[in-house]
Regions:
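Helix-to-loop junctions at the C-terminal end of transmembrane segments
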Residues: 31-44, 128
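Loop-to-transmembrane helix entry/capping segments in MFS-fold secondary transporters
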Residues: 15, 97-109
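Short amphipathic helix-loop junctions that connect adjacent transmembrane helices
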Residues: 1-17
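Structural signature of the two symmetry-related core transmembrane helices
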Residues: 46-61
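Intracellular juxtamembrane helix-capping segments at the cytosolic ends
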Residues: 84-97
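Transmembrane alpha-helical cores of Major Facilitator Superfamily
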Residues: 20-23, 27, 76, 107-115
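Symmetry-related core transmembrane helices of the 12-TM Major Facilitator Superfamily/SLC fold
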Residues: 135-152
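Helix-loop junctions at membrane interfaces in 12-TM secondary transporters
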Residues: 63-74
């Protein structure tokens, strides 16, 4: 709907552009998975520290963009961030808990995307009525705050020398 409203595209043209945007996100996610996540010697904390700002920037780009090309770059950034964030957050969450909590934590991590699919669309629809780009701006702000909180938590959890 965003592409129809913002770019005045027909439903068919909007669907094609959404498909290309999603493909750019998926390609970036796969690329980062097969390169950095699988082969780089980054710690999970390092990947978290890199991926969350990338996601915040991606949402900010979606909020501010004015051309489809910037939208595609933003979606590629989204794929890079998600491709690093999800596995590193899952690994960190299970590492920092007791063995008896690991199955519960893994279940919560697995359920988190489903909660986003349940609560995200109605909340985004409310924001969309105020300003069609507002859901992206709010997501960027929330990710920025989350990034700061995670940096603080990682700094506190870092071993002291």
């Amino acid at each position: 709907f965003y592409l129809i409203d913002f770019y005045q595209l027909s439903p068919v043209d909007a669907a094609q552009q959404v498909g290309f945007a999603m493909m750019s996100s998926a390609a970036a996610s796969l690329a980062i998975q097969y390169t950095v996540v699988q082969k780089a010697r980054m710690t999970k904390e390092g990947m978290i520290a890199l991926s969350l700002p990338i996601l915040a920037i991606a949402y900010c780009m979606l909020f501010l963009h004015e051309t489809l090309y910037v939208l595609y770059v933003a979606m590629a950034c989204m794929g890079l961030g998600m491709g690093m964030a999800y596995p590193s957050l899952a690994a960190a969450a299970t590492t920092y808990c007791t063995p008896s909590q690991q199955s519960t934590i893994t279940g919560l991590i697995t359920a988190t995307p489903a909660m986003g699919y349940i609560f995200g669309p109605p909340l985004a629809a409310l924001l969309y009525q105020q300003n069609i780009a507002l859901p992206f701006g709010i997501a960027s702000a929330l990710l920025s705050v989350t990034t700061c909180l995670v940096f603080i938590a990682l700094k506190r959890a870092a071993p002291k020398h």
